């Protein structure tokens, strides 16, 4: 089945969630290499290596499902770019599942069947670098999603600043006209003058809010860690 033909619309995801996805996808790189290493150690007689490889595979497979399908915390392939990476020409989902199947074959190979063990292990060793490169591409894709998320947040902040600036300018004009009218009214305009002063104070607070929003959006961001 072509998953791209039934792909879901893009979902807005928070920077916090994308950060967790970056960490999860980054851990997949480490697990893939650890699995191969433990299977090599098992082939040389390490009594605990096979169990470690089996646990690593379980974690790896579960994490892949979380990344692609999603769960109560993660949204799955929430963007067109991720859907294309996993289910398009790059075939990331299929290739990762093939790696999982090959690992399971190597783990389940009978100890007495040394030729089958050696064959399945040779295939995994050959695939160690390509799968690492693929998982690196996946991690980079999530990092790009983080960059897009940050750009969207900054745009919303900029739009908010523009709206507040427009309101502040209009309010300043109203306040200035009100002061002129109060001055012309003489003694009768004193009460109105108090109201214009309150309006001026509100405008001042609004200007401070605008500066705060601008300062927050211009604050330097630390590098995203995988």
Task: Give the label of every model feature segment.
Residues 12-15, 19, 148-168, 223:
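A conserved signal-transducing helical linker
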Residues 16-47, 173:
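N-terminal extracytoplasmic segments of bacterial inner-membrane proteins
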Residues 127-153:
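Juxtamembrane amphipathic/coiled-coil helical coupling segments that flank
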Residues 32-46, 67, 71-74, 102-117, ...:
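Secondary-structure edge/capping motif, primarily at the C-terminal ends of alpha-helices
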Residues 183-223:
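Parallel, heptad-repeat alpha-helical coiled-coil signal-transduction segments
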Residues 57-115:
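Heptad-repeat alpha-helical coiled-coil/4-helix-bundle sensor or tether segments in soluble regions
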């Amino acid at each position: 089945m072509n998953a791209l033909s039934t792909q879901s619309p893009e979902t807005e995801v928070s920077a916090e969630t994308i950060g967790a996805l970056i960490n999860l996808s980054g851990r997949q790189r480490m697990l893939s290499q650890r699995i191969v290493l433990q299977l090599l150690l098992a082939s040389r007689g390490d009594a605990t290596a096979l169990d470690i490889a089996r646990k690593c595979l379980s974690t790896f497979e579960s994490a892949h499902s979380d990344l692609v399908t999603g769960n109560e915390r993660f949204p799955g392939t929430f963007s067109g770019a991720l859907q294309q990476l996993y289910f398009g020409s790059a075939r990331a989902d299929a290739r990762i599942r093939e790696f999982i199947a090959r690992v399971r074959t190597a783990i389940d190979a009978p100890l007495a069947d040394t030729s089958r063990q050696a064959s399945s292990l040779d295939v995994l060793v050959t695939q160690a670098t390509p799968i690492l490169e693929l998982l690196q591409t996946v991690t980079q894709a999530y990092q790009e999603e983080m960059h897009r998320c940050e750009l969207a947040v900054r745009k919303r902040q900029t739009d908010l600043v523009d709206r507040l600036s427009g309101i502040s300018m209009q309010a300043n004009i109203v306040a200035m006209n009100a002061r002129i009218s109060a001055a012309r009214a003489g003694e009768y305009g004193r009460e109105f003058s108090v109201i214009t002063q309150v309006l001026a104070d509100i405008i001042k607070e609004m200007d401070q809010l605008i500066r705060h929003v601008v300062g927050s959006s211009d604050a330097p961001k630390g590098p995203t860690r995988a």
